[in-house]
Amino acid sequence: SSTETPPSYNQLNYNENLLRFFNSKPVTAPVELDPPKVEPSYVSSAREDARSTLSPVQGFEGSGGTGSSGNFTTGSNLHMSSVTNTSNAGTGTSGTGNSGGGGGGGGGAGPGNGAVPPVTLTESLLNKHNDEMEKFMLKKHRESRGRSGEKNKKSANDTLKMVEYSGPGPGPGHGHGIKRGGSHSWEGEANKPKQLLTLNTGGMPPLLDIHTSSASLSKCQASGAGGGGSGSVGGTGNIGSGGSNAQPSTNQYTQSGLSCTQNINLWPPFSVGITTPTSVLSTHTAVAQSSFSTQHNLFPTFYYIPASIAASSPSGTSPNPRPHKHTLVHKSAEQPSTSQAAAATMPLQYMTGLMYPHPSLFYTHPAAAAATAMV
């Protein structure tokens, strides 16, 4: 910023001074401890000059021009190579590491690095050079600070963009702040029936009572035929007629149960026109099939009582209401296992004296069905 104090020239030049010092290969150990090295001739001559009492200018010439002295940087060697040879103002260090003791305005002893003719140094020329180099270093300092500031700003903007676009959705910021778990395939397959199951049961009209179960079964049978099912549909009047023709109604109930459960797989998952318990059963079957496909062939035993069990009951009593009662209660017992809200909205209750296997969602053993039918 413009209000902060700019660094001094010595602070700006500190790193380059260190670089020049170590590039000049200063002597940091006694000669006896130095390991024998194969060195170029100019490096060895530079070390000899550093240990001798020669002037800094001669030492610099002997070292082959590996370093400059005073407050001048290596950039000055490009323009004023001969000036840097004798630019000791009494405060700097020579190229070989010895402190300069010469005067500031001494003339050049000879060409430094090339055939450029020596320039006579004056105090004004040195001051001008110092000012130019200070401006150059300040400019470089500002550029480095500007680059770092731009880099920090860019990284902050990238972070904001990542947070903004992290939400799963087509547009930017869609779903920002909403935690969503699971992949899209899981949400599309098995989560949708569960979510819409609770919606269906919540917005469903009250279920029919036990004594009106024959009407609901006839509706199931009619809808099974309308959905392109394989079951026979002629017995709607027989089921609704009561207990006078008990055995045909039981057989047709068996067929209607088969047609209902088989046609559930052919319907769309959520049919709008159906508000009977068959819609709930269809969602239940869809969830079951998407989760446990290995027990697909066992589903029909889940929804009907076999005709042999119904025929083995005493002929004096009409077995028509009993299978309906058991089956409807069995349906109501299966639904709360997937959703407690479904059990809260149903007027049907569990029957006393019966044992309901709670986690058995997909298969009821025939022996268990026979035991519950005999109660």
From Swiss-Prot:
Its main location: nucleus. Residues 245-255 have a biased composition (Polar residues). Residues 69-91 have a biased composition (Low complexity). The lineage of its organism: Eukaryota, Metazoa, Ecdysozoa, Arthropoda, Hexapoda. This is Period circadian protein. Essential for biological clock functions. Determines the period length of circadian and ultradian rhythms; an increase in PER dosage leads to shortened circadian rhythms and a decrease leads to lengthened circadian rhythms. Essential for the circadian rhythmicity of locomotor activity, eclosion behavior, and for the rhythmic component of the male courtship song that originates in the thoracic nervous system. The biological cycle depends on the rhythmic formation and nuclear localization of the TIM-PER complex. Light induces the degradation of TIM, which promotes elimination of PER. It comes from Drosophila sucinea (Fruit fly). Residues 145-156 have a biased composition (Basic and acidic residues). It is found in: Nucleus; Cytoplasm, Perinuclear region. Phosphorylated with a circadian rhythmicity, probably by the double-time protein (dbt). Phosphorylation could be implicated in the stability of per monomer and in the formation of heterodimer per-tim. Residues 27-119, 140-189, 219-255 are annotated as: Disordered. Disulfide bonds: none annotated. GO terms for molecular function: transcription cis-regulatory region binding; transcription corepressor binding. Forms a heterodimer with timeless (TIM); the complex then translocates into the nucleus. Keywords: Biological rhythms, Cytoplasm, Nucleus, Phosphoprotein, Repeat. GO terms for biological process: circadian regulation of gene expression; entrainment of circadian clock by photoperiod; negative regulation of transcription by RNA polymerase II. One of its GO terms (cellular component) is perinuclear region of cytoplasm. Residues 92-113, 224-243 have a biased composition (Gly residues). It comes from the Eukaryota. InterPro entries: Period_circadian_regulator (IPR050760).
